Amino acid sequence: MGKNVVVLGTQWGDEGKGKIVDLLTEQAKYVVRYQGGHNAGHTLVIDGEKTVLHLIPSGILRDNVKCIIGNGVVVAPDALMKEINMLKGRGVPVEERLLISEACPLILPFHCALDIAREKARGNQAIGTTGRGIGPAYEDKVSRRGLRIGDLFNAELFATKLQEVMKYHNFMLTEYYKVEAVDYQQTLDDALAIADYLKSMCTDVSEMLDVARKAGEPILFEGAQGTLLDIDHGTYPFVTSSNTTAGGVATGSGFGPRHLDYVLGIMKAYTTRVGAGPFPTELANEIGDYIGEKGQEFGATTGRKRRPGWLDAVAMRRAVQINSVSGFCLTKLDVLDGLKEVKICVGYQYADGTVSKVTPLAAEGYDLVTPIYETMPGWSETTFGATTIEQLPPAAINYIKRLEELLETPIDIISTGPDRNETMILVNPFK
């Protein structure tokens, strides 16, 4: 029987999931997105050519791989079409490889307008959303007024539903946020214009995955964002609007949780965060600047500068706990090359001297803690492009071993550069 593997981020996103998914899809027959939307940014570098995907699964560049967008993903038709056209322009036969659940909620222009208006109204309390309508679209889903891809296939009914929901949202835009209303007719026309095209790619995702599983075909589930941004388990309210954890696979694709064989947690050798929110190990100094510049830490979706910091083992233990991580992939180890010392956060200390090895459950709790660091020797030698453990300097190996001890979880894959071949697979998740 084939294995079913989940690849997800264990930090605040931007861990390097896209490259690892692309690498592992060589062994998969299906690659499935199960949450998030085009707020994700997965960067692939193949033979020096860079491709950034926001909505379509990273396996789309592989022959003989079916890419699936599950029901847990919110889909902006314009963003989807832009990505499809970009890939087709590069000669990728998207229609032959991509399948979509018709239960996916739609992101429409009024969702984006609401997202932007809310962030502006929050002022200094802004969450740091991408402004792409993700949160408002999930709100509509939960409130049971949302429109789904399947609604597009009945034009008359879609028009009626759209009119009702737009009355509600345009009232909020004009009367509360004091901004312009979104045009109903334009929204309707634009959505219906691609209905037939989308219909040709729609399928019953849960049924398809069940058939594939029973046939022994390996399936890879591609997470977006990261564990610490999970709507329930992240640094609330500075979180995304979906379940970014392994539990999201079942709800976002209809694949039974008992059939998952391996959870691969992607973890950078340091930590970054983009946008607002607590970050105990943040480095607002020269070392942080060094890491940020060397790691080219700019958001793939927004281009915003990411906030760098030391690796937080306390937060990573929480990620292991929530996701039942089988093994880690450590990425961007080479970014730490040249540092005299590297630090790992091993605990949090409160003002009264109390030490905790557990993360707070809400964002406010992080204001009360100071990170406790364990300092290790750095290394001057390069790790860039290393493909065997023996090629790594002893100090880098010790750093890896210490992380395994602290997290009580093996590091099964190590990434030492952006390209596919700059990777060492110590344990193959599919074997």
From Swiss-Prot:
Mg(2+) binds at residues 14, 41. One of its GO terms (molecular function) is adenylosuccinate synthase activity. InterPro entries: Adenylosuccin_syn_GTP-bd (IPR018220), Adenylosuccin_syn_Lys_AS (IPR033128), Adenylosuccinate_synth_dom1 (IPR042109), Adenylosuccinate_synth_dom2 (IPR042110), Adenylosuccinate_synth_dom3 (IPR042111), Adenylosuccinate_synthetase (IPR001114), P-loop_NTPase (IPR027417). It is an enzyme of class 6 (ligase). It comes from the Bacteria. Its EC number is 6.3.4.4. Keywords: Cytoplasm, GTP-binding, Ligase, Magnesium, Metal-binding, Nucleotide-binding, Purine biosynthesis. IMP binds at residues 14-17, 39-42, 130, 144, 225, 240, 304. Pathway: Purine metabolism; AMP biosynthesis via de novo pathway; AMP from IMP: step 1/2. Its cofactor is Mg(2+). Its main location: cytoplasm. SMART domains: Adenylsucc_synt. GTP binds at residues 13-19, 41-43, 306, 332-334, 415-417. One of its GO terms (cellular component) is cytoplasm. It catalyses: IMP + L-aspartate + GTP = N(6)-(1,2-dicarboxyethyl)-AMP + GDP + phosphate + 2 H(+). Binds 1 Mg(2+) ion per subunit. It is found in: Cytoplasm. GO terms for biological process: 'de novo' AMP biosynthetic process; IMP metabolic process. The active site is at 14 (proton acceptor), 42 (proton donor). Substrate binds at residues 300-306. Homodimer. PANTHER family: ADENYLOSUCCINATE SYNTHETASE. Plays an important role in the de novo pathway of purine nucleotide biosynthesis. Catalyzes the first committed step in the biosynthesis of AMP from IMP. Belongs to the adenylosuccinate synthetase family. This is Adenylosuccinate synthetase. It comes from Shewanella frigidimarina (strain NCIMB 400).
